[in-house]
Amino acid sequence: MRSGVIAQKVGMTRVFTDAGEHVPVTVLKIDQCQVVAHRTVEKNGYVALQVGVGKAKVKNVSAAERGRFAVAKVEPKKKLAEFRVTEDALIPVGAEITADHFIPGQFVDVTGTTTGKGFAGGIKRWNFGGLRATHGVSISHRSIGSTGGRQDPGKTFKNKKMPGHLGVERVTTQNLRVVRTDPERGLILVEGAVPGVAGGWIQIRDAVKRKLPADVPLPGKFRENGASAPATEAPAAEETA
């Protein structure tokens, strides 16, 4: 079981296959996704990798967190996440996982926070049918109707579907196909929609319900800490500094 990565949702576009068919894809960008720490059975009781992505302002990082980043010899990260892995899939601390960690054609599971919709009624939130348009119904066409019995049971049961806040929930979309990767720009293109808004953080991992292709890199595709980046990445890094 390999590590996943943290990416940022850029938006949606489409790509064309050799047969001329267009495929809708979501563009995900990896921005210096580095391994920050290891979790081991001896010390933590399980095996995992802690990875971080993005650059955080030092003033927004606590002293304890700054110390952990200093031990790992990485810059303070804006977003952290843990991924359970097997012993043979541990990546060295400080290594930067690149976009070609995933290969075209393989399936991945993506996790993100859905777009917030605010307070929503039963029709929008739960796909209720609403009441009749005529025959005595007035004003309450989009109401949810009865929420419980009268004397028996004489209450509304817990978890009854009712109006309320919609969105801002952690959702995992499974079995999305990787269409293309661009290691030089840190881009991963996956087929279909990904939960969340543009700019939101997305976790990408190998699909748990699909067989892993035999040619995926193990433990993963990464650059050692301090290794030189490809020449095409150097100007972009200077511009963002």
From Swiss-Prot:
Supply the Pfam families for this chain: Ribosomal_L3
Explain the post-translational modification. Methylated by PrmB.
PROSITE patterns in the cross-refs: RIBOSOMAL_L3
Task: Indicate what this protein is called per its UniProt record.
Answer: Large ribosomal subunit protein uL3
Gene3D superfamilies reported for this sequence? 3.30.160.810, Translation factors
On assembly, the entry states: Part of the 50S ribosomal subunit. Forms a cluster with proteins L14 and L19.
Biological process (GO), any one: translation
- Write the lineage as a comma-separated list: Bacteria, Pseudomonadati, Pseudomonadota, Alphaproteobacteria, Hyphomicrobiales
Q: Where is this region: Disordered?
A: 140-162, 217-241
Composition bias, Low complexity: 229-241
Modified residue annotations for N5-methylglutamine? 151
GO CC annotation: cytosolic large ribosomal subunit
Q: Which HAMAP family match?
A: Ribosomal_uL3_B
Gene label: rplC
The alphabetical list of record keywords is: Methylation, Ribonucleoprotein, Ribosomal protein, RNA-binding, rRNA-binding
Q: Does the keyword Phosphoprotein apply?
A: no
* GO terms, molecular function: rRNA binding; structural constituent of ribosome
Q: What does this protein do?
A: One of the primary rRNA binding proteins, it binds directly near the 3'-end of the 23S rRNA, where it nucleates assembly of the 50S subunit.
Protein family (similarity comment): Belongs to the universal ribosomal protein uL3 family.
